Every structure is written in C-alpha cells, then in structure tokens.
From Swiss-Prot:
Belongs to the NAD kinase family. GO terms for biological process: NAD metabolic process; NADP biosynthetic process. Keywords: ATP-binding, Cytoplasm, Kinase, NAD, NADP, Nucleotide-binding, Transferase. The active site is at residue 61. Pfam families: NAD_kinase, NAD_kinase_C. It comes from Clostridium perfringens (strain ATCC 13124 / DSM 756 / JCM 1290 / NCIMB 6125 / NCTC 8237 / Type A). GO terms for cellular component: cytoplasm. InterPro entries: ATP-NAD_kinase_N, ATP-NAD_kinase_PpnK-typ_C, NAD/diacylglycerol_kinase_sf, NADK. This is NAD kinase. One of its GO terms (molecular function) is NAD binding. HAMAP family: NAD_kinase. Its EC number is 2.7.1.23. It catalyses: NAD(+) + ATP = ADP + NADP(+) + H(+). NAD(+) binds at residues 61-62, 134-135, 145, 162, 164, 172, 175-180, 234.
Amino acid sequence: MRNIGIIINKEKDKENEILNLVILKVKEYLNPDEIKVIDQFYKGDYKDLMALDLLIVLGGDGTLLGVARKFSTVIDTPILGINIGNLGFLVTAEISELDEALYRIKVGDYKVEERMLLSCTIEGVTCSEERALNDIVVARGTLSRMAQYEVFINDELYATFKGDGVIISTPVGSTAYSFSAGGPLIMPDLQIVSIVPICPHTPNSRPMIIDGNNKVRVKPLINESDVFVTIDGQKALKLEKHNEVLIKKAKEFFRIISFDNKSYFKVLRKKLFKIE
C-alpha cells in the first residue's frame, strides 16, 4: 500500500503518543510511500484523499461514525478501525492488536466488507443530503411534549402513532439506539432497514423491517412540540411545521477491513452482552 491516511480522535491522544506509535508501526509493516495524517474535522481538498490505499481511523465508535458521515460521499478507501476509545463495537481491532492487524494487511490476510449507509434529506429545507452509518432519528426535544408521527413506505402510509420519536436504522445501527428502544439485532452485511418507534403511546406500535431499497418518509405532526432529526447521534436539525424527512439507502457504502478471527457473534457476546 503506497499511500496511507491516519485519522485520530485528538481528545483521546492529546500528547500524540498513540499517533506516533501507529506511524512507526505502519512504516515497519507496510513501508508506504506517504503517510498522511488527517484532522477528523478536515476541511481541505478531498481530491487529496482519493489516492489513499488505506485509511486508519484511531478512536472509538463515535470517531468511525463521524468519518463515515463526513467522507463516505467522496472516497471509498478501505478503513481500518483501531479502538482507542470505550466501546469500540464497530472497529476492526483494539490498539493492543495493532501489530497483528498491520501484519495481516501486509500479507493480504483480510477482507473488505461493505456496510450500508442511509441518505437523509429534509423536504422543505435547502440543505445537502446527509449520510448515516447507524441511524436517522426523528424525535421530540428533551423538554417537549409527545408528538405524533406519520411514517410512509414508498409513499404509502404505514403507521401513525404518538410517542417520543422514531428510529430508522441500518443493520450496523441495530446494536445502537435501536437496540435500546427494543429493535431487532440485524446481521451487518444485510441490506435492510428497521423502523423502530421510541416509547410509543399507541397500542401495537412495533418495530418493522423492510428491504433496503424501500424509501421511508417521516412526517411529524408538529404542534407544541419541538422535533429534531439527528444523524448518527452527531448532527441535529430542528424541524419546522410541514417539514418531512426522506430516508433511503445511499448509493455509497462504508468499506471496512475485517479479519476472519473477529466473528460478528463473538463481538456481540463480548461487547454487547458482556459474555466472554
């Protein structure tokens, strides 16, 4: 691999100790022509990133989500996620496994898996499409009253319910907020979407799973409630009356490196169920 980029969550490595270690190890194992350290809030020319053969992301799940949201529309470089954070459910390896991970990449003992992304636009608002690796949440503000929501699938009304909100989740996001709200766990390589009501006050409001090629439209009936759309828990936009949230499968994918010894169920048991 000739060109390698590194993105690090500086809040978790203020003295650059981890960054310097990773640069040293990358040179030792992969001997690249160039190593480019990229700020996670990068505002430069994205053309500079298109030549990367590998992007190493140092942080936790939040850092990976931010990278997916920010860079997925401009580069399709395989990503090696190294956990230096807390949960690290989405990452490829822990920092203690760095040597093994780089060696496996050196000898080609890895695979690149594609993860589904969601695309989100707000009807009635001039804004760019947003991308989400985990979920799009349409929900009331913290101090707001309960709101009512209409959910359409391919422009046909699916349900109307009162509650705190609704989560539109990818398979990757099924282990996040959706899981806490009673949504199903979904194998990450599937191309499906779950629709999960949050604290519904309407009888028989249950999660729904649909094919990823379907389009979802959420119409909050806003009266006295403040309602927001939140992308991967990182970016929030307040909705006004008559705004509708349009959600569909993005044309891009999040491409992450994985190893055969890290099975999905093994990670579930260890990090979600706390079973070794």
